[in-house]
Every structure is written in C-alpha cells, then in structure tokens.
Amino acid sequence: MTLKTIPDIRKILYATDLSDNAIYAFRYAMSLANRYGGGITFLHVLEDISSFGNTLVTSILGEERWKELRKQNEQKVLDAIKERLKAFCEEAVRDLPECPFITDEIVVKIGNPAEEILKQVDESDCDLVVMGSHGQGLLEDAMMGSVSRRVIRRCKKPVLVIRLPGA
C-alpha cells in the first residue's frame, strides 16, 4: 500500500455565525489560505423560523401576507449580512496585513446551519471546512457546539474546529 501525500488546501469553506469570537476561527482560515495559496468561501447561515413560529405567524397574518412579508424582507436581510461579512473580511485583512488571502465567494443562506454547511461543501467543492466551536448549555454542550458536531460527523471533507479562547 502506497502512502499518498496530503492534498493541497486550495478551497477553504469558512462557516461563521458572525459572533464576537468568530475572528479566532477566521484567523486559522486566513493563515491556511495564505500558506497554501488558496481562497476562502465565507458562509453564514440564518436559522429559519421554527415550524411552530411559522404556524403562529401564519395564523395571525394569514398565509399570503406572511409569504409576501418574508419575500420582501428576506433579500434585504441577506444583503445586509453579506455586507457585514465583507466588512468582517476587510477588518481582518487590516488587522493582519502580513496574511493576505483571496475571497472566493461570500454566501448567506437560510436554513438549518449544519445542513447548509454540508450542502455548501459540495457546491464549492472545498478542500477544508474551518469553523468555530461554542457549545451552549450543559457543559458547553459536551465541549463542542451541536452544529460543529453534526458537520464533523457527516462531512466528506476534513473539518477544522477551532475552540474559542476560554472555552
């Protein structure tokens, strides 16, 4: 059996929740992209309204009005978050000018975070996923966030999960 070399890391998917601690995981993505001459696809997923919430709002506003409001505002929200991601990226480059990288794409989706990350891995044909870990609740969710756990379990590509300082 011959040992193959580690594949190049040319396409990195950086999944972010845009929290204050997101910069820590992003620095790893920047460093890897810089070192291997790769690019970064940024992904932020907005969790969709629960089925209970959807039913409640529909019962109050009516189905047609609720669909109309969602359609009108959904793109505005996605565009605003995309702008926030661009600013986040520019700020990081200013803070670490010695570590330039290429931004391949900025993607904002609505849905289940783990599912959308896994879909984006396939769509972007990335070589590596970088994301932060921050569980909530019971022992910090057994030391890893539920989204990162689900992505690790099901992802076909390597996943680098960055523990946040003090976590």
PLM regions and their residue ranges:
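Short glycine/proline- and acidic residue-enriched helix-loop micro-motifs
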Residues: E64-D79, T103
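Short, well-ordered secondary-structure micro-motifs
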Residues: F52-N54, L118-K119, A142
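Small/aliphatic-rich secondary-structure junction motif
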Residues: L3-K71, P97
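Structural beta-alpha unit
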Residues: M1-P7, I49, S59, E83, ...
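Short, flexible loop segments at boundaries between secondary-structure elements
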Residues: K157-P165
